[in-house]
Amino acid sequence: MKTLLLLFFIFTQFPILPQKHLEELNKLLNDAYKMDLFSGVVLFADKDNVQFLKTYGYSDWESQTTNLTDTKFNIGSIGKLFTQILIAQLIQEEKLNLTDNLKQIYPLYNNGYDEKITIKHLLTFSAGLGDYFMIEDFEMHPDDYRSTEALLSIIKKQPLLFEPGTSTEYSNSSYVVLGGIIEKLTGKTYLENLKERILNPLTMNNSGFIYKDSKRINTAKGFIVNPDGTKESTYERMPNVPTPAGGMFSTAEDLLKLDRSLMNDNVLLNDEHKVLLLNRFNSDIKMSFAELLSKPDFGMGVAGGSPGWNAVYDQNVGNKYTVIVLSNIDNGAEVLIDRINSILREKKYPPLKMNTGRFIYEIVKEKGVDDFLDNYKDYLSGYMIEHDGLLNRIGYQFLNKGMTDEAIAVFIINTKYFPDIANTYDSLGEAYMLKGDNKLALENYKKSLKMNPQNKNAEMRIVELMEKEN
C-alpha cells in the first residue's frame, strides 16, 4: 500500500490563498500524487509574498527519502535561461552584439559556417545546429565531455541542419556554442561565470552543477513510472552532464530569487536589457520595462525535462504571480502547470488522466486480451500514441512477467498504429516465439526483416525458427 506523503510547508508570515483556490490546488496536487503523475515541489507567489509552498513524494523512491522545500531538482533546459542572462550581460557590457557572427568573435568551423551564424541565430534556435545528445560518442561516453571545449570538439564536426536564419530547430548544441563564447569573452569557465554573475549575487546557494560523482546533499533522483506502476531510477543510465544548454540543479525558492531579480531589481540586468531578454532577443520591439510589465497578456514560461525530470518556471507578469513546479517524475510539472494556472484564474481545466502507459497496462489486465483487441480504439480515444516505443515498452512489461498473451495483444495494436515500423513486428515475433507459435513468429520476423534488411536480430531468429521447422 502506497503511503501518501504531503509535507505542507506554509509559514505563518505567508498570506493565505482564497479558500476556494487553496482547496482546488490541494485536490489537484493530491490527485496527481496518488495517480503517480507527480512527485516534487510546487511554489506559488504573488508580487509580494510566497503564498503556497508544498512538497509531495520522495526525492529517492528507493530509500523513501522525502522531498523537502530545499531539495535540489534537475531543471533541464531552464538552464538555457541562465545562459541567455549571461549573454544579455555581455551585450549590456558592450562586449557582444546580437549581429556578431562566429567569425568575428569565436571561430569554430573551417567550412564557411562561421560567417553565417550570428549570436541571435544561436539564441533563437535558427543557426542550423542540432543536438549533441544525438552524437554517438557523447551518448556512449558523456563523462568525457564535461567541459565546454570538449563538447564543442564534437559539435563542430556535425553538419548544419539548414542554412542559418532560414528555419528553426530546437538545439542544445547552439547553447553550448554560446557557453564557449561566454568563456572566451570573460576568460573564465561557464560555471565560474554562472556563480559569479548570477548565483552568488542572488544568494542562490542551492543551485549549480552536480555530476554523478559529486557529493549529493539533499538532491533528488529522477524516476520514471513503469506501466505496471513500479518506479525506476534514471540515475545510473542517464548522462547527467550539466552544460550551458541545461542540466543544472536548483530549488523552487532559488528560482524565485531569480524571478524576483528579473522583475524587481537591476542586480543582473538593467531595464533595457531585461526587455531584450524577456522579448526573446527581438531588438525590433521598442518599449520600456514598465510598458512591458503593464501588458496584461505578458508572461514568460520556460520548461525543462529529461527522463525522470520535469520543471516549469511560469512568470505571469500580467496577472502578477509566479508558479514554479519541480518534479522528479516524468512530465510531472507540465501535467500540472496549465491546471494550476486555470485554478488561479478561475477557469475550467480538464481532469487529470492516468499516465498513458499505466492506463493501457491496467485496461489490458482488467478487460482481458480479447476485449482490448476488439475495443482498443474506444479505450485509447482520449490518449495520444505518439511513437511505437510506448506500446513496445508496455508489451515488454507483460512479457517480462510471463504474461505472453497480454504482450502479444499490445504488440499487435502497435503494428496497427505503426504499420511501417519494422521493430513493431520484431517484438511481436519475439512474443509469438516465446509462446511457442513458431509459424506466427516466423511470419512477423520475416516482415520485420523485409522492412529493415539491417535487422540482425530478425535474421538470426528466422534461421533458428526455420531450423526448428526442418
Residues of each region from the PLM?
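Short active-site loop at a secondary-structure junction
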Residues: 33-41, 63-124, 162-171, 243-246, ...
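Catalytic loop of the DD-peptidase/beta-lactamase superfamily, centered on the K-T-G motif
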Residues: 19-54, 183-188, 192-196, 200, ...
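Active-site helix/loop module of the DD-peptidase/beta-lactamase fold
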Residues: 20-23, 74-78, 92-134, 157, ...
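Catalytic-site signature segments of enzymes, centered on catalytic residues
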Residues: 133-216, 242-256
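Helix-start (N-cap) detector for alpha-helical repeat units in TPR-like alpha-solenoids
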Residues: 81, 388, 404, 422-423, ...
